[in-house]
Curated annotation (Swiss-Prot):
Disulfide bonds: none annotated. InterPro entries: Ribosomal_bL19 (IPR001857), Ribosomal_bL19_CS (IPR018257), Ribosomal_bL19_sf (IPR038657), Translation_prot_SH3-like_sf (IPR008991). The gene is rplS. It comes from Vibrio cholerae serotype O1 (strain ATCC 39315 / El Tor Inaba N16961). GO terms for biological process: translation. Belongs to the bacterial ribosomal protein bL19 family. This is Large ribosomal subunit protein bL19. This protein is located at the 30S-50S ribosomal subunit interface and may play a role in the structure and function of the aminoacyl-tRNA binding site. One of its GO terms (molecular function) is structural constituent of ribosome.
Amino acid sequence: MSNIIKALEQEQMKQDLPQFAPGDTVVVQVKVKEGDRERLQAFEGIVIAIRNRGLHSAFTVRKISNGEGVERTFQTHSPVVDSIEVKRRGAVRRAKLYYLRDLSGKAARIKEKLAKK
């Protein structure tokens, strides 16, 4: 029984997702339906948490909009998420960056990860 469920979940999972980690700055293209038409809306911010649960995986992105912190959680394999693009890699030493909620301005910046040679 569980093999059938795993096979169905594997079939529904997206295969073309980029590798990203907490601290990375990403642009998530989200499908937004307005009336009878559909358009893409970009949400750019820092990944503060990732939840890996197969088909039920999710990640949280935080950005500052008009001086106000905005967090949005996306289901990784959702059909609403059109694409994910990694803008820059962040060098962090935590899996969950919830401490960024208390920081503002320059204190909330994350160093860029240097490429390995």
